[in-house]
Amino acid sequence: MSNLSRDLVEEIHSRVPITSQRAVRSTCKRWNVLSKDQNYTKHLGPASKEIMLIMIRGCRAHLMSVNLHGVHNHKYLVDTSIKELGKLNQVEIFEVLHCDGLLLCVTKDYSRLVVWNPYSGQNRWIQPKSNTFHTLDRFAIGYDINNNQKVKVLRFYYWSDYVEYEIFDFKSNSWTVLDVTTHWKIHRRSVSLKGNTYFIAHERFKVDQQGEFLRCFDFTKERFGPRLPLPFHSCLDDSVILSSLREEKLAVLFKKCDACDMEIWITTKIDANTVSWRNFLKVDMQLYPERFRSPCRSFLVDEKKKVAVIFDIDRKTWTNYKPYMVGEDGYQGEVDLRDSELWMLMCSYVPSSVKIQ
């Protein structure tokens, strides 16, 4: 087997479930070495026509593969094939954050965190300073690009005028308070990209006048970057949701509370200090009178098919979410994910060989 070409080895690995990769890597020394190549792991997982997702069902985190082969076939119900690639069974999960193949999972009871790499099977538990984390705690995950991709976790806490930021160091197994003073507040879900984490933020005392903006936390420098512009003016009542495209681009969904249009923008350039945008999709919401009346929870973009899958509130239960697809020229569809009302999309997923220290 050690004499097989790299192309053939990649083809073999691409057909193996993510959580079974460890057994395949142990087949021979060359395969194990190859599996640690970051350029190689980018091509792992399902074929390019499929999308890997992290979803929660019954407080369990699942790694799923979805094939949107029914897109643009002029049917309202979009037929999909979905299969489970992995599952984190040890604990009930409230939230999942993704960074370069690593998942930061917040437990339902806020008693601890777990960082999990479905590709390598590694996991690492993180304990709070006191008995438990606070329900107002927010988290982010990233890594130091100058230190062998050293993984770090950011915790931040807002209460009235009090703000606290901490970094968890895996080597010392301890939390360190950051000397950071901010005059703005983060209140929406974050997204990690290329080791850094991006947040939607607003000024703490001039919300409506200033509007919202983008902030990046640089895990290498352990500090926030400058204020970055969004391609629109938004306030707290509007829907503004971040997503990522294969750890390469940032996407943002925007729907003004009193407007009939919904927009999705994608970055053409982004780092801790600069950002530029292009409009990916603009949807006339009058075509969907029964949908998207309340803020959606999450979304993902298929750039090649020029569609977006949006998890919107289910009008039957008003507690669960269902996935709907929108695209150019009024294209729409309901995505059949098998009991989709029981699932919650957290983020897209890209496998990686990044190690948890």
Each language-model region and where it sits:
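N-terminal entry/capping and adjacent linker segments that precede and initiate structured domains
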Residues: 1-357
